[in-house]
């Protein structure tokens, strides 16, 4: 932000255990919110990207089945800039996509069946907070942080240096290049 205050350590990557616990609670309340949450966790999507992901899930599925290692995030991106995001865990991403496809078929072609994007976003955030308890250090943004950690580990396992892994992950998150030090604070 503009204040110049450090945001270091204000949010944490959600643990797998806490994620599964929240997901189970949320799934019981709203399957669409749960499906959206899974896409966010395994593709590092921002809230608006996750809510609008329904427009791309079939394309993403085809891309992954074709062997692509990235999917293109087009809708809901910051500044309308499309980006390619690394598929770190193919099985989990495909499972999340398949669940989202089934969900959309039951929900008038939407993941969260609300009249407007803003109402869908509000419902997504509210259910994650109230039902899943995802707030403070375990906010919904902690899903994106968890993806970032997975992506960084993936790149390091492929032989990239820590600095390269941070830069590549930064690009996956849609931060552009040259902001690699952001990831180290995740």
What are these regions (language model features)?
Residues 37, 48-53, 169:
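Alpha-helix N-cap/helix-start motif at helix boundaries, enriched for small hydrophobics
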Residues 58-61, 174-182:
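Short, basic interhelical loop/turn and adjoining N-cap
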Residues 1-21, 78:
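Flexible interdomain linker/hinge and immediately adjacent N-terminus
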Residues 28-32, 39, 136, 140-141, ...:
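Residue-level marker of regulatory loop/turn positions in helix-turn-helix DNA-binding domains and
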Residues 16-47:
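Basic, Lys/Arg- and aromatic-enriched nucleic-acid-binding interface segment
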Residues 38, 142-177:
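C-terminal catalytic core of tyrosine-transesterase DNA break-rejoin enzymes
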Residues 52-95:
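Conserved tyrosine-mediated DNA breakage-rejoining catalytic core shared by Y-recombinases
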Residues 88-153:
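Active-site/catalytic core of tyrosine-dependent DNA strand-transfer enzymes
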